[in-house]
Amino acid sequence: MKVVSSIGSLKNRSKDCQVVKRRGRLYVICKSDPRLKVRQGGAKMKRK
């Protein structure tokens, strides 16, 4: 899975790709070609 800063152009790579929001992160998942998986949103800094 790749981590990218913008998934705007990556959501149209295949007709089976779909955008899903889980736990505050955006994912592009593709059932037909799992190599196309990407995630947007990184780790948040925790307060001590």
UniProtKB/Swiss-Prot annotation:
Any single GO CC term annotated in Swiss-Prot or TrEMBL for this entry: ribonucleoprotein complex
GO molecular function: structural constituent of ribosome
Keyword Ribonucleoprotein annotated: yes
A biological-process GO annotation: translation
SUPFAM superfamilies registered for this protein in UniProt: Ribosomal protein L36
Primary location class: plastid
InterPro entries, per the entry: Ribosomal_bL36, Ribosomal_bL36_sp, Ribosomal_L36_bact
Localization per record: Plastid, Chloroplast
UniProt keywords, alphabetically: Chloroplast, Plastid, Ribonucleoprotein, Ribosomal protein
Domain of life: Eukaryota
PROSITE patterns: RIBOSOMAL_L36 (PS00828)
Pfam families per record: Ribosomal_L36
UniProt-listed NCBIfam families: PRK00831.1, rpmJ_bact
Membership in a protein family: Belongs to the bacterial ribosomal protein bL36 family.
Protein's name according to its UniProt entry: Large ribosomal subunit protein bL36c
Classification lineage: Eukaryota, Cryptophyceae, Pyrenomonadales, Pyrenomonadaceae, Rhodomonas
